[in-house]
Amino acid sequence: MKTRLKQLYSYLLIVLFFALISACAAPKHHILETEKDYQEAFNRIYFQGHAQMEVPVNYGRIDLLTGDYAIEVERIDKFHEGIGQALHYAKETRRKPSLAVFITDPTEHELEKLKYVRKLCQSLGIKVWYINEELEKAHKKK
């Protein structure tokens, strides 16, 4: 009986070991949570990774810089700060001001806020991207 129990125990350990190895080797779906996550994903999808990231300027750091745009990446809740930073970075670099906003868990209220931000930025001459939308477009193309 003890021998049979030892064999069963050994078999169970081997199965658990291989299950653990398989779980670690399985591809992981990347979940976007932080501003940096959205910044990197937007650069990769929209600019094919060619935008410069975190470029220092006087009194700040540009999230993404292209030949045309100085881009501030920001949560929709912090759009006020994002607009100010976009204008500042555009002046520092002689590029067009732009704001790339994201929403981690879209609600009706936040989508209404996005509409407001788009209108406000249009009146200020700031290009706006909704990162969630751009990532969804890229996902549908695949």
Provide a role label for each language-model segment.
Residues 2-12:
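Bacterial N-terminal signal peptides that target proteins for export
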Residues 5, 24-25:
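Short Lys/Arg-rich cationic patches that frequently serve as NLS/NoLS or arginine-rich RNA/DNA-binding motifs
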Residues 11-20:
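Bacterial N-terminal signal peptides
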Residues 25-67, 76-84, 90-91, 109-127, ...:
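Active-site metal-binding core of divalent-cation-utilizing nuclease and nuclease-like domains
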Residues 71-74, 99-101:
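Short catalytic-loop micro-motif centered on adjacent basic/acidic residues
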Residues 90-91, 95-103:
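Mid-chain, well-packed structural core segment of small domains
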Residues 105-107:
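A short acidic, glycine/proline-enriched capping/turn motif at secondary-structure boundaries
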